[in-house]
Amino acid sequence: MADQQQNPQESELLLTSAGYVSTFPAPGLRRTVRHITGHNAEGKGVFIQTDCGDHHRIIGNEQALANIIYSTKETPVEMNGDVDLKYAKENEPPLHIHNGSVCRMIDFAPNVISPMHRAVSLDYGIVIEGEFKLILDSGESRIMRQGDVSVQRASAHQWHNITGNGTLPGRMMWVLLDCKPIVINDIDFMECSQ
């Protein structure tokens, strides 16, 4: 696919599975562009798709936008015949996928605090733009700045966008990988949202 230029007038309109979103809870963040590679008939790497992702959803009382960059249904990933491309396009993933992976970008409106939640997965969380407070259910917290990474090992947590002292939007990206069930003191910890 040829390089695509972003129309500045459309920078706050994001494609959803139902069409374009007319309002965006985190104005000022540039549109995320996804570049997917593959191979030509000679086995050389080529760009096969450039877009903004297949699945977008306004979440958190219309205060955040989730963009699924890519997802897979198995590990190792089957890429022959482009079966992974078909799966990612046709299936909006849940929080995480058993034996698979999810790459999710979330744009947060200013001062948004997510609910306390737990995913039974190993999550790599990267601050792309802004500053966030990662709060654990124990009460412990850490400030994360652009480029910082959290390794979330299925613990209950929440995110607070503190960018510009809570006056600006922020963006994070997560890569979620499946993990075995978490058992502590004979208690099986499940996914939850409070």
From Swiss-Prot:
* One Pfam family linked to the record: Cupin_2
Instruction: Look at the named UniProt entry and state the broad enzyme category this protein falls under.
Output: oxidoreductase
Q: Quote the EC number.
A: 1.-.-.-
A single Gene Ontology MF term assigned here is: oxidoreductase activity
Question: What InterPro entries would the database entry show?
Answer: Cupin_2, OryJ/VirC-like, RmlC-like_jellyroll, RmlC_Cupin_sf
From the UniProt record, give the pathway where this protein acts: Secondary metabolite biosynthesis
| Alphabetical keyword list | Oxidoreductase
Q: Which residues form the Cupin type-2 domain?
A: 106-175
The organism sits in which domain of life? Eukaryota
Q: Please give the family membership noted in the entry.
A: Belongs to the virC family.
PANTHER family, per this entry?
Answer: CUPIN TYPE-2 DOMAIN-CONTAINING PROTEIN, SLR2101 PROTEIN
Q: What does the UniProt function comment say about this protein? A: Cupin-domain-containing oxidoreductase; part of the gene cluster that mediates the biosynthesis of virensols and trichoxide, fungal natural products that contain or are derived from a salicylaldehyde core. The pathway begins with the synthesis of the reduced chain in virensol C by the highly reducing polyketide synthase virA via condensation of one acetate and 8 malonate units.
The name under which this protein is listed is Cupin-domain-containing oxidoreductase virC
Which gene codes for it? virC
